[in-house]
């Protein structure tokens, strides 16, 4: 779940 939530972590 990195590509889709890349904006969530910063």
Curated annotation (Swiss-Prot):
Highest taxon listed in the record's lineage: Eukaryota
Tissue: Salivary glands.
Protein name: MP2 protein
Lineage summary: Eukaryota, Metazoa, Ecdysozoa, Arthropoda, Hexapoda
């Amino acid at each position: 779940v990195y590509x889709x939530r890349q904006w969530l972590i910063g």
